[in-house]
C-alpha cells in the first residue's frame, strides 16, 4: 500500500447531518477506504460501461461543486479524480474501483454554460441513461455547495432522480467556508426542501474535503450501503 493511500487514524469530526455510527463502524470504513483504488475507465456510451457486477455509488453535482475533491478526499488521494480546468468539460462517466469490491462513479457535472447546448444535452442524456440502467447503483450522492444551497438546476436534477426512482442523498460540500450557524441553516433548509421527495434519503450530510469534515461518516455510509447490506 502506498503512503498516499494510508488514511490517518483520527477521531471523526462531526458536522450537522452526520449519522449515528459507532467508533467501530467509522474505523472499519476508514480501513476499507485505505485499500487500493484505481481509475478503471471513462465511458461515453452505455454499452462501453463496466458490467453491473459490483455495487456502485455515484456522485453528481453542478460544475465546480467539488466532486473530484470529494472523491479524492474519501480515498485520501490528491489526483485520483481529476477536475477539469474549464467547467463543463468533463464529458465522460468515470469509474473507480475500490478494494476490488465497490465502484465509485463520477458523473458529468451539470449547470455549465461554456459548452454548446447540443454537447450539454448529449452528456446529460448519458447521465440519465446511466441512472435508469444500473441495477447495481446503490445511491447517488448529489453534491451541493454549502455556500449557495439548492439552485434551480439542482432541483431539476432532483426531479430527474425522482422520476427515475433512484435513491439519492444530498451532500453539502465546502462546509468549512461558512460559519457553523450558517451550516446549520443550510442543512435545515435543504432537509425541508427534500422532505416530500420520494427518492431522497432524508439526512443531509455536511462535508469539507479540505478539512476532512464529515468524510468519516460518508465513508461509513457507503460501506453500509455496499458492503454491510
Curated annotation (Swiss-Prot):
The gene is engB. Pfam families: MMR_HSR1. It comes from Caulobacter vibrioides (strain NA1000 / CB15N). Its cofactor is Mg(2+). Gene3D superfamilies: P-loop containing nucleotide triphosphate hydrolases. Keywords: Cell cycle, Cell division, GTP-binding, Magnesium, Metal-binding, Nucleotide-binding, Septation. The lineage of its organism: Bacteria, Pseudomonadati, Pseudomonadota, Alphaproteobacteria, Caulobacterales. Mg(2+) binds at residues 68, 90. GTP binds at residues 61-68, 88-92, 106-109, 173-176, 207-209. This is Probable GTP-binding protein EngB.
Amino acid at each position: 500500500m502506498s503512503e498516499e493511500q494510508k488514511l490517518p487514524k483520527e477521531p471523526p469530526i462531526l458536522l450537522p447531518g452526520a449519522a449515528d455510527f459507532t467508533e467501530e463502524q467509522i474505523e472499519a470504513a476508514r480501513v476499507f477506504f485505505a485499500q487500493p483504488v484505481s481509475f478503471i475507465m471513462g465511458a461515453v456510451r452505455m454499452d462501453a460501461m463496466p458490467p453491473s457486477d459490483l455495487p456502485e455509488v455515484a456522485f453528481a453535482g453542478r460544475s465546480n461543486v467539488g466532486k473530484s475533491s470529494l472523491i479524492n478526499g474519501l480515498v485520501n488521494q490528491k489526483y485520483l479524480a481529476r477536475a477539469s480546468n474549464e467547467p463543463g468539460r468533463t464529458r465522460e462517466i468515470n469509474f473507480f474501483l475500490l478494494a476490488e469490491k465497490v465502484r465509485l462513479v463520477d458523473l458529468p457535472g451539470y449547470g455549465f454554460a461554456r459548452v454548446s447546448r447540443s454537447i450539454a444535452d448529449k452528456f446529460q442524456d448519458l447521465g440519465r441513461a446511466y441512472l435508469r440502467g444500473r441495477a447495481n447503483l446503490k445511491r447517488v450522492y448529489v453534491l451541493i455547495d454549502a455556500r449557495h444551497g439548492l439552485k434551480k438546476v439542482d432541483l431539476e436534477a432532483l426531479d430527474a432522480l425522482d422520476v427515475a426512482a433512484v435513491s439519492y442523498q444530498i451532500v453539502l460540500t465546502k462546509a468549512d467556508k461558512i460559519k457553523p450557524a450558517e451550516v446549520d441553516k443550510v442543512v435545515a433548509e435543504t432537509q425541508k426542501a427534500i422532505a416530500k421527495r420520494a427518492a431522497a434519503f432524508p439526512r443531509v450530510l455536511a462535508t469539507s474535503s479540505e478539512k476532512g469534515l464529515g468524510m468519516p461518516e460518508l465513508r461509513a455510509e457507503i460501506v453500509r450501503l455496499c458492503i454491510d447490506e
